[in-house]
């Protein structure tokens, strides 16, 4: 998260039937919500997010950005692509429903063209389907699947597209991937039906958006645990650093959570005494240097602040102890639906505190979702 980022908790739309979409407020699912009056009622505007690999993104952008420019101009939709240092990228499409569907059609037909071109140099005789991956708040996936899978079965049968909702949430988010495969026409019809479901069943609670991780990530230590930095987040590192973790634990044993120890501020473990640890890290200096303290602010909806604080402050104290950061939660302000959290410490402390706060929010929001 950047400075002052807010985690958005959408208001709940009144339930309506499929024939009354024109009466919905302008809805950016996965974004913000605004209401614009137009002739004949309220105009529906959507924001839909797609997850793409680098090669797919390159196809969408085209030479010198010509392809994406053409898509923007001809569809009337806003098409934004996330930063390029990740193997996966988020493509965000925003606009009135007609513009959204035009943009989807252009993307689907472009991918089909890529498949046909790749087959000209391949012995394969059967053309593989076009595949797109949507990113959808987990709390909406239950409505998309339907009771006993009835809704998703209906969408498959009526459009001819294959639709799969991932069982697990995307890392460090409250969103799931929805994979759509088929002909471009089938995909377009499928996306239209999914949009109807999204409008009918807005997200419940706060949505923590998925942010793809960079291809290579530095490593920090805090609380005796190895973490990788992914953008603004500290994520528990995978098994390949188990050996390094064990080395660090041997050098600086940490007490169980809740026991006091003057050596436990949650700071990085001193690795300079272990040559083997340095070699594993791929760098020989700088890990034990203490960077200057900095401050990061974020806002949390009032209805979620309790899960961060915990009973008698137990959860926030755990987060402080594990991260080594100073964390202050502002008092509730009259008329405001949010509380400000100020995190102070080294960049490593702040990243770890953010990760732990997001983990608490993910747990709470997942419990809210009617999946």
From Swiss-Prot:
One of its GO terms (biological process) is negative regulation of transcription by RNA polymerase II. Keywords: Cytoplasm, DNA-binding, Repeat, Ribonucleoprotein, RNA-binding. Pfam families: KH_1. Disulfide bonds: none annotated. Widely expressed, with highest levels in testis and fat tissues and lowest in heart. GO terms for cellular component: cytoplasm; ribonucleoprotein complex. Residues 45-95, 129-182, 293-357 form the KH domain. It is found in: Cytoplasm. GO terms for molecular function: C-rich single-stranded DNA binding; RNA binding. SMART domains: KH. The keyword Repeat applies. PANTHER family: KH DOMAIN CONTAINING RNA BINDING PROTEIN (PTHR10288). Single-stranded nucleic acid binding protein that binds preferentially to oligo dC. This is Poly(rC)-binding protein 3. It comes from Mus musculus (Mouse). The lineage of its organism: Eukaryota, Metazoa, Chordata, Craniata, Vertebrata.
């Amino acid at each position: 998260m950047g400075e002052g980022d807010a985690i958005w908790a959408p208001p709940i739309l009144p339930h309506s039937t499929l024939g009354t979409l024109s009466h919905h407020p302008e809805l950016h699912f996965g974004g913000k919500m605004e209401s614009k009056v137009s002739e004949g009622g309220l105009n529906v505007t959507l924001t839909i997010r797609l997850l793409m690999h680098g090669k797919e993104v390159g196809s969408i952008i085209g030479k010198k950005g010509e392809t994406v420019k053409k898509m923007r101009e001809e569809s009337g939709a806003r098409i934004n692509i996330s930063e390029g240092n990740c193997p996966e990228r988020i493509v965000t499409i925003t606009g009135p429903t007609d513009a959204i569907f035009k943009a989807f059609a252009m993307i689907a037909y472009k991918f089909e063209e890529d498949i046909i071109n790749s087959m000209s140099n391949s012995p394969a005789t059967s053309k593989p389907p076009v595949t797109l991956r949507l990113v959808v708040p987990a709390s909406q996936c239950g409505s998309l699947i339907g009771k006993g899978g009835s809704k998703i079965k209906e969408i498959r049968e009526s459009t001819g597209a294959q639709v799969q909702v991932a069982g697990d949430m995307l890392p460090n988010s409250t969103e799931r991937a929805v994979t759509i495969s088929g002909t471009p026409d089938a995909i377009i019809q499928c996306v239209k039906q999914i949009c109807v479901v999204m409008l009918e069943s807005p997200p419940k609670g706060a949505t923590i958006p998925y942010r793809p991780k960079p291809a290579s990530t530095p490593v920090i230590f805090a609380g005796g645990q190895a973490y990788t930095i992914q953008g603004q987040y500290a994520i528990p590192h995978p098994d390949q650093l188990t050996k390094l973790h064990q080395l660090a634990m041997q050098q600086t044993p940490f007490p169980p959570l809740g026991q006091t120890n003057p050596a436990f501020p949650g700071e990085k473990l001193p690795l300079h005494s272990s040559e083997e640890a340095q070699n594993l890290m791929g760098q020989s200096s700088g890990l034990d240097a203490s960077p200057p303290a900095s401050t990061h602010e974020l806002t949390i909806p009032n209805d979620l602040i309790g899960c961060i604080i915990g009973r008698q402050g137990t959860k926030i104290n755990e987060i402080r102890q594990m991260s080594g950061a100073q964390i202050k939660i502002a008092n509730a302000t009259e008329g405001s639906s949010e509380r400000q959290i100020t995190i102070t410490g080294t960049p490593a402390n702040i990243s770890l505190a953010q990760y732990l706060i997001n983990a608490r929010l993910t747990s709470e929001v997942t419990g809210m979702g009617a999946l």
